[in-house]
A protein has these predicted regions:
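DNA polymerase processivity clamps
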Residues: 1-161
Length: 161
């Protein structure tokens, strides 16, 4: 089964380009952190990247070609390598203001295509870090005026053998 999304080429390029500084450098130990986590819910694609010390998030509008029976959209999470931003720039996504890309997500791969180009990226073979629970805890501490030390706990938990 695949899920297909449509997003403006410039939005897709800009999302990944803004995430690239927060992704980890190439590493045999942590290849998952070289990728950008993308989640689609309702009409928004949210990108998130971390190198264990920084966390970047941003979003852009997206149209899903698949929905549930009651009209709500199906949430889907997938990743793309941070280097996809370079691929998109090379193909002119950064300047294609009126062109849209189709993003097709399957269990094995993510395919990004336009009228003139098609890029396929393998699916991530490992779980992306569960930053949602860490962020929820951090936001709770911040609203209570407390200090946030989630980065240390996250690094210890994630890097534990």
């Amino acid at each position: 089964m695949s899920t297909i999304y449509t997003i403006a080429c410039t939005d897709l390029h800009n999302l990944l380009a803004r995430m690239k500084p927060a992704t980890a450098k190439a590493s045999d130990r942590l290849p998952v952190l070289e990728r950008v986590r993308l989640s689609v819910d309702a009409f928004t694609m949210t990108a998130m990247a971390t190198d264990r010390y920084r966390l970047f998030m941003d979003s852009a509008p997206v149209v899903s070609e698949e929905g549930t029976e009651d009209g709500e959209r199906i949430a889907r999470v997938f990743t793309l390598p941070a280097t996809a931003a370079d691929d998109f720039k090379r193909l002119g996504f950064a300047k294609a203001e009126h062109e849209h890309a189709k993003v097709e997500v399957t269990a094995a791969e993510v395919t990004v295509s336009t009228g003139t180009a098609r890029l396929t990226y393998p699916a991530l073979g490992a779980d992306y870090p569960q930053t949602g629970t860490l962020m929820a805890g951090a936001l709770e501490k911040i609203t209570e005026g407390g200090a946030v030390e989630t980065a240390t706990a996250y690094n210890a938990d994630y890097l534990a053998d």
